[in-house]
């Protein structure tokens, strides 16, 4: 309100309506039973709060150090085995382990247990396409499940060979997957 010549003038701010709809789309996935398997790679601990920015940096450092000649990075393995809510997890840049090869210094092997995995395809440039699907899995898909629940503290990213795409893993058609272990409720 403003006073003009002793009288009050009223101003009406226009009403704005904001509507936000979430969900309402079909998440593509398949259930796949996989035997246990062993991966080899480099492992580092991260905070969930900073993971979205620091894990892409971990990948960048991996290749800058020349570690891509040992492990090209077929998998990104999120390991939170105790699932204790500590706010941290271990992340491994890994390949399937070939027992005929030596394990380079600074690398480890990790056995991934047998599970039924919900496998989600991701299409698009990294890391945004993968992070978008991952967010939908944990904020919308998992909470809405009626028949299954999260089975263990693993989340695996599987990456296609980037050399098959004109713009590598930044290509709009780049393919990757997210694997989530599930079990019947």
Q: Which residue ranges define each predicted feature?
A:
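A solvent-exposed interaction/effector surface
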Residues: 2-185
């Amino acid at each position: 309100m403003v006073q003009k010549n002793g009288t009050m003038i009223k101003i009406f701010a226009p009403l704005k309506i904001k509507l936000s709809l979430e969900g309402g789309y079909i998440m593509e996935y398949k259930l796949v039973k996989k035997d246990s398997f062993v991966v080899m790679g480099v492992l580092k601990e991260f905070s969930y709060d900073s993971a979205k920015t620091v894990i892409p940096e971990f990948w960048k450092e991996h290749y800058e150090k020349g570690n891509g000649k040992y492990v090209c990075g077929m998998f990104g393995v999120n390991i939170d085995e105790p699932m204790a809510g500590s706010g941290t997890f271990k992340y491994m840049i890994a390949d399937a382990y070939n027992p005929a090869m030596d394990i380079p210094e600074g690398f480890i092997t990790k056995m991934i247990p047998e599970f039924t995995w919900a496998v989600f395809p991701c299409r698009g440039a990294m890391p945004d396409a993968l992070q978008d699907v991952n967010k939908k899995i944990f904020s919308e898909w998992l909470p809405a499940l009626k028949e299954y629940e999260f089975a263990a503290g693993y989340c695996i990213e599987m990456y296609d060979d980037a050399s098959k795409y004109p713009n590598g893993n930044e290509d709009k058609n780049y393919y990757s997957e997210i694997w989530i272990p599930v079990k019947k409720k």
